């Protein structure tokens, strides 16, 4: 891939994550999320669980924990054939990417034309 295409794709992925942040913060009823921005978002590799891109407006403390949460979903679903279209995993287990009980994780697959492209973490 040439450097220009790579830069364009990188910028687009960053914009997607930033728009995820903005949408949640704008629509949140809870002032802790709406005003303090106590959340983070990211796109993750569906095989390894590694971070592809993350939003810039959320709290940095979640960024490290989010990859562990995504990896936990990948590991839990491996026996049943992996994450399937339409599934959403929501949990607050502090041993699987958690920080404390009031922080929950939401992981959902992103498919395009039947191909799993990434896992979305909110």
Predicted segments, located by residue:
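Conserved small/polar residues in nucleotide/adenosyl-binding loops
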Residues: 120-122
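Short beta-turn/strand-loop junction motif enriched in small, turn-promoting residues
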Residues: 29, 94-97
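Short, Lys/Arg- and Gly-enriched loop/turn segments at beta-strand edges
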Residues: 97-103
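Glycine-rich acetyl-CoA-binding "A-motif" of GNAT/NAT acetyltransferases
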Residues: 116
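Residue-level detector of beta-strand face positions
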Residues: 42, 88-92, 109
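Long, charge-dense accessory insertions within large macromolecular proteins
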Residues: 1-66, 70
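A short, hydrophobic, proline-anchored segment that marks a local hinge/packing element in signaling
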Residues: 103-112
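A charged amphipathic helix-loop-strand protein-protein interaction module that recurs
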Residues: 17, 60-94
């Amino acid at each position: 891939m040439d450097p220009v295409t790579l830069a364009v794709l990188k910028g687009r992925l960053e914009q997607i994550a930033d728009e995820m942040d903005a949408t949640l913060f704008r629509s949140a009823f809870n002032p802790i999320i709406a005003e303090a921005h106590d959340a983070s978002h990211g796109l993750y590799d569906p095989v390894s669980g590694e971070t592809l891109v993350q939003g810039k407006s959320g709290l940095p403390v979640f960024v490290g924990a989010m990859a562990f949460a995504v990896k936990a979903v990948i590991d839990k679903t491996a026996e049943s054939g992996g994450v399937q279209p339409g599934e959403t995993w929501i949990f607050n287990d502090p041993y699987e990417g958690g920080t404390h009980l009031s922080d929950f994780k939401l992981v959902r697959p992103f498919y395009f034309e039947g191909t799993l492209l990434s896992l979305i973490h909110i």
